[in-house]
Curated annotation (Swiss-Prot):
This is Conserved oligomeric Golgi complex subunit 4. Residues 618-740 are annotated as: D domain. The gene is Cog4. It is a peripheral membrane protein. GO terms for biological process: protein transport. One of its GO terms (cellular component) is cytosol. Signal peptide: none annotated. It comes from Mus musculus. It is found in: Cytoplasm, Cytosol; Golgi apparatus membrane. The modification N-acetylalanine is found at residue 2.
Length: 785
């Protein structure tokens, strides 16, 4: 029997994939089928063929379904045939035109390149010829100019020679005329060296004789000879001698001046001002010359030399200032006095006043001068660096910062300001202490003298620091003033308020004695004790009220000072003084100052609370308690009698008015209004307590409503505080006490409340309803609130 595949292998072969077109033939050949003899093998082959038949049928069905689409596409393709033939012809024609154009362009561009090459060679030839002619012209011209002593013209010829292209000259030397060119070059080089020597000699003679026109004449020639640095160096040396001569002359005038002169107190500041103005005039005068003849970016070199001389002269002036004003000696005395438990004799603050003013003026003039230099150099660099890289610009900025920040002028002023801050601190502290010690009160005034005196001193010290134009100095003084106001001055006011308002009842007397003992104990611990004796009650009351006014004015003055400083420093920052870091430091100092204002407000609230509890509450409570002695379970006759002869509220209002009138004359409007607000809160709380202890009938509730309305109407006229909100609970209690029946409350409660917000809880509503003697408890308990 022929060898055939096993049925398992045949049956395990994968069927052809469905839906795949393309005439797949069966893998089972006719010969294979004929060779099969077993039934099982025949069945396996049969199943395989059936599967292939089904796949072919599916593929055929899919092709038949696409027949219409394919036929329509074929029709479309037949129609497109003529058009495609036309397009093919046009495309061939276009390709031919492009090929022709490309060839033509290539021919033209090659000829243009040849023309460019010829033109460049022609230009080079012309340049070479021009340079040879220029060389000959320069050689002839410089000889003639030197003979005629026309040094400007000679320098112009040398400058023209120096600008010639050296490579062209080198090529010319290799040509036929090389020997002639070498001769011309040698003559020009000799003329160059000769002219340099002449210019240097003439410039030296002019500077020695002080002939400014001649100095400027030869100064302009240096850059034509390529001697930029040499020219700037020599010219700067001449200018520095001028500066030194004038500065020494001014210093001699200072040392010989009359100390009674009007400007004697600031004579050293004036001397520095003259020095700075002289240098500024030199820069303004010669900047156009430097820019024109030396080019932009060269002004920095000139100013660098001038600043060295400026530092030398500043050092001389400052040394004379320190010696003549005893600046260091005064600083040492101040430093010793600032130390606790120091036995050094105290220096009088007013002796420091003129010295401190002069130091800040000196620093202000220095800052103005340095800002002038920064502005001029930056503008010059900006023009010169217009095409430079970012690295070059940054390097120039570093050089500028180094020059101005590290110069001796800046360091010296920084040292003087460091001493100034310590001395100004001493001046402020001592004068503030003196103002507190000499505190007086004039009748009719709301505040005592020390408030105006202290803030005059603080403003003067901060203003003086501000006038220095040094942000670090200003911030230091703001911090010192903040500390002085917060610690020392606030403690003075705080101790006065802690003495309390004079007591009027036995309980208040006991509290006042305890407070006084605490203050005395605190004073003894600090080594200070006031031996003036115990003031009378009226004086103590007035002292307490004046202190309250002082605290309120201090808070307002600090806020005003903060706003003023913000405005003044905005102008400083707009002038370019300081930067973002200085702005942040200044803002931080102002925040600390504002915090002190808030602490004074807190102290004021503590004082008001003490006044309210000591003076208002002991009086108001008994007046409110008389409400309990007035019956509110009344008949029609009594109700009418109450209307004619009010039993409580009118007298209560009169008592309040009389009591508050005493405070109104002695307190500032702001404090009086705050005290009135505390009083109204007290009245609302205490009245609610006595109402809950009373009983009412319908007419009594109506009477209470009238009394409450009268009281609210009066209190509304005496304060700007919101009264109705404080009396909202009492008003709702009056509404409840006016109800005709218990269930009427439901017309005002819950969903029926409308815009009304109930301040009373359901339990409190039931408590108020229970005050009505004509309401039954059973009805009240049945309410669903």
């Amino acid at each position: 029997m022929a060898e055939v595949e096993s049925p398992l292998k045949l049956s395990g072969a994968p069927p052809p994939p469905e839906g795949v077109g393309g005439g797949h033939c069966s893998e089972i050949s006719t010969e294979l089928i004929r060779s099969l003899t077993e039934l099982q093998e025949l069945e396996a082959v049969y199943e395989r063929l059936c599967g292939e038949e089904k796949a072919v049928e599916k593929e055929l069905d899919a092709l038949l379904e696409q027949q219409n689409t394919i036929e329509s596409k074929m029709v479309t393709l037949h129609r497109m045939g003529p058009s495609l033939q036309l397009i093919e012809g046009d495309a061939k024609q276009l390709a031919g035109m492009i090929t022709f154009t490309c060839s033509l362009a290539e021919n033209v561009s090659s000829k243009v390149r040849q023309l460019d090459l010829a033109k460049n060679r022609l230009y080079q030839a012309i340049q070479r010829a021009d340079d040879i002619l220029d060389l000959k012209f320069c050689m002839d011209g410089v000889q003639t100019a030197l003979r005629n002593e026309d040094y400007e013209q000679a320098a112009a010829h040398i400058h023209r020679y120096l600008c010639l292209d050296k490579s062209v000259i080198e090529l010319s030397r290799q040509g036929k005329e090389g020997s002639m060119i070498d001769a011309n070059l040698k003559l020009l080089q000799e003329a160059e060296q000769r002219l340099k020597a002449i210019v240097a000699e003439k410039f030296a003679i002019a500077t020695k004789e002080g002939d400014l026109p001649q100095v400027e004449r030869f100064f302009k020639i240096f850059p034509l000879l390529g001697l930029h640095e040499d020219g700037l160096s020599k010219f700067s040396e001449y200018l520095c001698k001028q500066v030194a001569s004038k500065a020494e002359e001014n210093l001699l005038l200072v040392l010989g001046s009359d100390m009674s002169d009007r400007r004697a107190a600031v004579i050293f500041a004036d001397t520095l001002t003259l020095l700075f103005e002289g240098i500024a005039r030199i820069v303004e005068t010669h900047q156009p010359i430097v820019e024109t003849y030396y080019g932009p970016g060269r002004l920095f070199t000139l100013i660098k030399y001038l600043q060295v001389e400026c530092d030398t002269q500043v050092e001389k002036v400052v040394n004379k200032f320190i010696k003549q004003r005893d600046y260091h000696q005064q600083f040492r005395l101040v430093q010793s006095n600032l130390m606790r438990n120091s036995a050094t004799e105290k220096i009088e603050p007013r002796e420091l006043d003129p010295v401190l003013t002069e130091v800040t003026l000196m620093n202000a003039r220095s800052e103005l001068y340095l800002r002038f230099l920064r502005k001029r150099i930056s503008a010059d660099f900006e023009v010169g660096d217009s095409m430079a890289s970012e690295e070059v610009k940054q390097e120039h900025q570093k050089c500028l910062d180094k020059l101005l920040n590290n110069c001796l002028l800046s360091c010296t002023m920084q040292e003087l300001i460091g001493f100034y801050i310590t001395m100004e601190e001493y001046f402020m502290r001592e004068t503030v202490n003196k103002a507190v010690a000499l505190d007086t009160y004039e009748k009719g005034q709301l505040t005592s003298s020390m408030v105006d005196d202290v803030f005059y001193i603080v403003k003067k010290c901060i203003g003086r620091a501000l006038s220095s134009s040094n942000i670090d100095c200003l911030c230091a003084m703001i911090n010192l003033a903040t500390r002085e106001l917060e610690a020392d001055f606030r403690d003075v006011l705080c101790n006065k308020l802690r003495m309390g308002f004079p007591a009027t009842t036995l309980q208040d007397i006991q509290r006042g004695v305890t407070s006084a003992v605490n203050i005395m104990h605190s004073s003894l611990q600090q080594g200070k004790f006031d031996t003036k004796g115990i003031e009378s009650t009226d004086e103590a009351k007035l002292s307490f009220l004046v202190t309250l006014n002082n605290v309120e004015v201090c808070s307002e003055n600090i806020s005003t000072l903060k706003k003023t400083l913000e405005s003044d420093c905005t102008k400083l920052f707009s002038q370019g003084i300081g930067g973002e870091q200085a702005q942040a430091k200044f803002d931080s100092c102002l925040s600390d100052l504002a915090a002190v204002s808030n602490k004074f407000r807190d102290l004021l609230q503590e004082g008001l609370a003490e006044l309210n509890s000591s003076a208002v509450k002991p009086q108001v409570q008994p007046w409110i308690n008389t409400f309990l002695s007035v019956s509110h379970s009344i008949e029609e006759e009594e109700f009418n009698d109450y209307e004619a002869n009010d039993p409580w509220v009118q007298q209560f209002i009169l008592n309040l008015e009389q009591q508050m009138a005493e405070f109104k004359a002695s307190l500032s409007p702001v404090i009086y209004d705050s005290l009135t607000g505390l009083m109204t809160s007290l009245v609302a709380v205490e009245l609610e307590k006595v109402v809950l202890k009373s009983t009412f009938n319908r007419l009594g509730g109506l009477q209470f409503d009238k009394e409450l309305r009268s009281l609210i109407a009066y209190l509304t006229t005496v304060t700007t505080w919101t009264i109705r909100d404080k009396f909202a609970r009492l008003s709702q209690m009056a509404t409840i006490l006016n109800l005709e029946r218990v269930t009427e409350i439901l017309d005002y409660w819950g969903a029926n409340s409308g815009p009304l917000t109930w301040r009373l809880t359901p339990a409190e509503v039931r408590q108020v309803l229970a005050l009505r003697i004509d309401f039954r408890n059973e009805d009240i308990k049945r309410l669903r609130l």
